[in-house]
């Protein structure tokens, strides 16, 4: 169990989880508020 916890705390695993969360968040924001990635002045 200690090795599994050490594996989950490594950088590639944390980076993958963070990028998955970020991509999902951006997708959901764009679903409810489309075309907000471009800034229109």
UniProtKB/Swiss-Prot annotation:
Keywords: Chloroplast, Membrane, Photosynthesis, Photosystem I, Plastid, Thylakoid, Transmembrane, Transmembrane helix. It comes from the Eukaryota. It is a single-pass membrane protein. One of its GO terms (cellular component) is photosystem I. GO terms for biological process: photosynthesis. The keyword Cytoplasm does not apply. It is found in: Plastid, Chloroplast thylakoid membrane. The chain crosses the membrane at residues 7-27. Its main location: plastid. Gene3D superfamilies: Single helix bin. Belongs to the PsaJ family. May help in the organization of the PsaE and PsaF subunits. This is Photosystem I reaction center subunit IX. It comes from Thalassiosira pseudonana (Marine diatom).
């Amino acid at each position: 169990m200690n090795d599994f916890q050490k594996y989950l705390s490594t950088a590639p695993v944390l980076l993958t989880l963070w990028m998955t969360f970020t991509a999902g968040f951006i997708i959901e924001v764009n679903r409810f508020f489309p075309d907000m990635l471009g800034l229109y002045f």
